[in-house]
Amino acid sequence: MNTLFMHCRPGFEGEVCSEISDHAACLDVAGYAKARPDTACAEFICTEADGAERLMNGQRFDALIFPRQWARGMFLELPETDRISVILAQLSAFPACGSLWLEVVDTNDGKELSNFCKKFEAPLRKALMQAGKLVDDPRKPRLLLTFKSGREVFLGLADADNSAMWPMGIPRLKFPREAPSRSTLKLEEAWHHFIPRDQWDERLSGDMTGVDLGAAPGGWTYQLVRRGMLVTAIDNGPMAESLMDTGLVQHLMADGFTYKPRHPVDWMVCDIVEKPARNAALLETWLGEGLCREAVVNLKLPMKQRYAEVRRLLDRIEEGFQARGVRVSIGCKQLYHDREEVTCHLRRLDVAKAATK
């Protein structure tokens, strides 16, 4: 099991290869990354048998930017019939697992395999349980089968608490009909990724205040209002009337890059389409000057050297806070609902909660 298999957004295979190669080098795991363009997946081939396991044990999955999901294991060719027997034979060297996910890559060809996986899962699950390879124990590793076709599958393992929270890393979020734009799903997914669900009532509570920079028509504002927050929406464009009618939104016609609140707020969110360095500077200003406690900001990516640019900006942000003597946590992820962008979440660790509304 010396191969680390990773899912990603189509077109970002090179970024996954660059990122995982950096982490492997830091952990002294020898190997090489490979991928084909627009296949929505990449591999890191370790030269040592335990390399993939050491890499996964030494790296938190939720700290990775571009991979959506990962698993260590091997590829297996399947016959046209009796696939289950072949899979069971190969799994003899695998430990018993506590859960089973059947996955496909995020391409048109991959999506065509979804129905096959749905039909195949029940008999496979039954066979695995009868063989003692699948038990009801969340502490045990997760068995991940990624089907490249009906004749090829990647048999993989991952710790349930150190891998994606959804199959393939794709959230099943429902678009709210009353939301003004589909961008609302980006912020909802960001909260799922960056904030543990059992902390939502504390960190996304109805007695908080927020600012949405570049708010119109209000996709991100909607998520704040949905949590009951009092929101200041900054944009020269019009806001959705449905949001204004809630009485929770104050709309100010102003420049999102120059606006500053009179009093600190709990949340700042921003999805302005601008050069990533300008949006990154907003994070430094708002968190560094204590204007907010937490922030979610999208960084639009350049056409080339995307991982290198994101890494450079994150390093600059971290160095800036260190120079200020400000303690923050920094997270960054290319979410499923992101396109040519990544989403950053920052949280100050040394300021009190803003005054309640």
Curated annotation (Swiss-Prot):
* Keyword S-adenosyl-L-methionine included in the entry's annotation: yes
| Subcellular location(s) of the protein | Cytoplasm
Give the E.C. number(s). Answer: 2.1.1.186
**Which residues does the entry assign to the active site, renumbered to this chain?**
300
Which BP terms in the Gene Ontology apply to this protein? Answer: methylation; rRNA processing
**Enzyme class name:** transferase
Q: Which GO terms describe its molecular function?
A: S-adenosylmethionine-dependent methyltransferase activity
Entry GO terms, CC: cytoplasm
Sorted UniProt keywords: Cytoplasm, Methyltransferase, rRNA processing, S-adenosyl-L-methionine, Transferase
Q: Where does S-adenosyl-L-methionine bind?
A: 183, 216-219, 235, 255, 271
SUPFAM superfamilies cross-referenced by the UniProt entry = S-adenosyl-L-methionine-dependent methyltransferases
InterPro entries the UniProt entry points to? RlmM_FDX, RlmM_THUMP-like, RNA_MeTrfase_FtsJ_dom, rRNA_MeTrfase_M, SAM-dependent_MTases_sf
Keyword Nucleotidyltransferase (UniProt):
no
* Catalyzed reaction equations: cytidine(2498) in 23S rRNA + S-adenosyl-L-methionine = 2'-O-methylcytidine(2498) in 23S rRNA + S-adenosyl-L-homocysteine + H(+)
Q: Where is the signal peptide?
A: none
Similarity annotation: Belongs to the class I-like SAM-binding methyltransferase superfamily. RNA methyltransferase RlmE family. RlmM subfamily.
Summarizing the function annotation, the protein's role is: Catalyzes the 2'-O-methylation at nucleotide C2498 in 23S rRNA.
Subunit structure of this chain's protein? Monomer.
**Protein name stated in the entry:** Ribosomal RNA large subunit methyltransferase M
Q: Which organism is it from?
A: Pseudomonas savastanoi pv. phaseolicola (strain 1448A / Race 6) (Pseudomonas syringae pv. phaseolicola (strain 1448A / Race 6))
